[in-house]
Amino acid sequence: MKLLKGSGAALLALFFALVYLLPINSRLLWQPDETRYAEISREMLQRGDWVVPHLLGIRYFEKPIAGYWFNNISQWIFGDTNFAVRFGSIFSTALSAVFVYWLATLLWRNRSTSFLAALIYLSMLLVFSIGSYAVLDPMISLWLTASMVCFYLTLRAETAKQKIGAYLLLGLACGMGFMTKGFLALAVPVISVLPIVIQQKRVKELIIFGPIAIVGAVILSLPWALAIAQREPDFWHYFFWVEHIQRFAEKDAQHKAPIWYYLPILCLGVLPWLGLLPAALLKGWRERVARPELFFLLSWVLMPLIFFSVAKGKLPTYILPCMAPLSLLMAAYATDCANKMHMRALKVNGAINLIFGFICALAILVIGMGWVGHLVAYGPQEHQKVILATIAFAGWGIVGFATMRNNARHWHWAAACPLLFILLVGYLIPQQVIDSKQPQNFIQNNFNELSSSRYVATDSVGVAAGLAWELKRSDILMFSEKGELSYGLNYADSGDHYISAQDFSDWLVHARQKGDVSLVIQLSRNEKIPDSLPAADKVSLMNRLALLWYKKTP
């Protein structure tokens, strides 16, 4: 802890640079998420339209606007690079860590604990996986974290003026959250604070001052809400009923999963700090009266977790907002353990990292080398990747072992367990995964044919977004499948963006009279190119991605 106290800021900055900045540009974009958000912002900048999101020139109503604004600004500053695509998420994660540090300082007035909380947060597997990935979840997590910090300020406020200011800030944070991901940003803070206001008997205060937060949120979001309602009257109907009600509650909700789905996600997500999880949560409950700030954090963790577990639609990214309060609970528990020399949990944490690292290293070595016949992850030419992956996870285990030694004296170095893996992960991905989920590699290998084509079509929205991003054109056509663009394609002015499988042959005859045609299809595992497709002048196949190139006819 002395090391954190003496040079915590420098160590934290170094860790952030190594994990969140250094390796980011070299990693290819993943489809469908990263290619989608990259292309939406590229098109917004190209069109100069910061009100209505479009993807491939088609209306895209799945999310509000603020997250795209983050990404727009990133691309405007850093250009069309993978780093720019991910910088919005990285910046949001950094600000979330700042809020974690600030709240820890407000709670405990201890710089070492504050730095530790921020370090735990930034080093959590779920946080750095999503926080360096181009999705909107780091941004909504930022605003939910900010809203809970603002709510804590309302609890500390002593005068009516201070309470009004704190509730106004709370409303502004919720308003930004709403403009990032919708009504979720309003529901999560409300359910998080209910147990707190009940325990502290502040229900009356919430009723009196709560409307100030509502007014603040409305004032912030109303200009864009009215602007898009004027431009696209159907936006709010689609966004509310389809994106919220169906996704979370109805029988046909997207990404359905059992109620216990988040338990293993939570355990994996807090690595390399899993050994602190049970006792930190238990401490928050046992000391809820003596240390009400721990109950504040516990409610912030559990209420959203219960809410997302009950909802039918589930994704691992949904519980990212739970990581900030968890890091604070863990920091408080670890600090108490270290101060009282109760090192058992810290040793257990090291043992978990040791076991996890070496089990993963062994599994990758055995499977990667083809020693388990029916499990094929890497090709015969990818043994170097297998060795690097084995070394990366072995490094995780070695650091875990080091944190156990000398009575867990260096327990806080658990943050370094995933460091080697993070730095190398871009070079460890099997080629079959790259060719399926990272279309930039495929596009670059077939760039001449694709860039010279008058028409480019594909049967995957994620691949289409990748094509549009790499080729800097938004007129990529959808072939056979509509995917998440189904709603936007229903508009009369977007009908020509889609070609059905039945109409493709006739369409191709006319299209080839105007120029070359490229069709990119994504195959299932071991699937062959369908015989029903017209014979191409050139075929390029890379695992599950295939390019059928048709030359212009005289």
From Swiss-Prot:
Pfam families: PMT. The keyword Glycosyltransferase applies. Its EC number is 2.4.2.43. The chain crosses the membrane at residues 4-24, 87-107, 115-135, 178-198, 206-226, 262-282, 293-313, 315-335, 352-372, 384-404, 410-430. It is an enzyme of class 2 (transferase). It catalyses: 4-amino-4-deoxy-alpha-L-arabinopyranosyl di-trans,octa-cis-undecaprenyl phosphate + lipid IVA = lipid IIA + di-trans,octa-cis-undecaprenyl phosphate. InterPro entries: ArnT_tfrase (IPR022839), Glyco_trans_39/83 (IPR003342), LipidA_mod_glycosyltrf_83 (IPR050297). Pathway: Lipopolysaccharide metabolism; 4-amino-4-deoxy-beta-L-arabinose-lipid A biosynthesis. It is a multi-pass membrane protein. One of its GO terms (molecular function) is 4-amino-4-deoxy-L-arabinose transferase activity. GO terms for cellular component: plasma membrane. Keywords: Cell inner membrane, Cell membrane, Glycosyltransferase, Lipid A biosynthesis, Lipid biosynthesis, Lipid metabolism, Lipopolysaccharide biosynthesis, Membrane, Transferase, Transmembrane, Transmembrane helix. It is found in: Cell inner membrane. One of its GO terms (biological process) is lipid A biosynthetic process. Belongs to the glycosyltransferase 83 family. Catalyzes the transfer of the L-Ara4N moiety of the glycolipid undecaprenyl phosphate-alpha-L-Ara4N to lipid A. The modified arabinose is attached to lipid A and is required for resistance to polymyxin and cationic antimicrobial peptides. This is Undecaprenyl phosphate-alpha-4-amino-4-deoxy-L-arabinose arabinosyl transferase. It comes from Yersinia enterocolitica serotype O:8 / biotype 1B (strain NCTC 13174 / 8081).
